[in-house]
């Protein structure tokens, strides 16, 4: 693998968006030109809304659980094959700073109250969304998209006196029809290559 200076980035600025489960991401070409601060102006990639302000000190954390493997052997060969014992579960955790209906809805689930001015919490609700994270470093934009994610609170609400309050929200990637669980998007970095996909 050759050194590629253009593939090195600093997560200087970023945006997080949600949409109804199944919503497609912007195309690699669209990602280069869309107005990241106003998803209502996007053509060809509609349905997205920004989650608003997110933590600068704790950037989105892309993680996974599981995916453990064991080495199995035969009588003739002790280390014959590595077998995955469980599928990995991928997710991203985002700290939301806005205490509005959308953010509380991502943290707790949809508003269960019908009273104006009240956000009601009802446990056991299904909360699924498509998620899109865009990292912007100068002219470079790197997108991360999942067609469907289970959305839930990841930790306790943070209420420090010397920093911004935060709602830690976890998006756990789920299977959606025949789509890939998640994808990274950049027209210049991920061209077609022999033996590789798009």
Swiss-Prot record:
Q: Which gene encodes it?
A: 23
- Return the GO cellular component terms, semicolon-separated: viral capsid
The record's subcellular location field reads: Virion
Query: What is the protein name given in its UniProt record?
Result: Major tail protein Gp23
Write the record's keywords in alphabetical order, separated by commas.
Answer: Capsid protein, Virion
């Amino acid at each position: 693998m050759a050194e590629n200076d253009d593939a090195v980035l600093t997560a200087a600025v970023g945006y997080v968006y949600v949409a109804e489960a199944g919503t497609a991401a912007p195309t690699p070409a669209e990602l280069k030109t869309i107005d990241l601060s106003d998803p209502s102006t996007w053509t060809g990639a509609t349905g997205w809304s920004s989650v608003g302000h997110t933590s600068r000190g704790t950037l989105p954390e892309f993680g996974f659980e599981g995916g453990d493997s064991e080495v199995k052997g035969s009588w003739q060969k002790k280390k014959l094959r590595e077998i995955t014992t469980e599928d990995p579960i991928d997710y991203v955790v985002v700290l939301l700073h806005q205490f509005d209906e959308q953010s509380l809805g991502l943290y707790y689930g949809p508003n269960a109250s019908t009273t104006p001015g009240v956000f009601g919490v009802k446990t056991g609700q299904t909360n699924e969304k498509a998620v899109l994270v865009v990292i912007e470093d100068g002219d470079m934009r790197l997108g991360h998209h999942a067609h469907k994610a289970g959305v839930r609170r990841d930790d306790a609400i943070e209420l420090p006196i010397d920093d911004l309050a935060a709602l830690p929200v976890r998006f756990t990637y789920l299977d959606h029809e025949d789509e890939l669980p998640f994808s990274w998007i950049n027209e210049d970095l991920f061209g077609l290559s022999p033996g590789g996909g798009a």
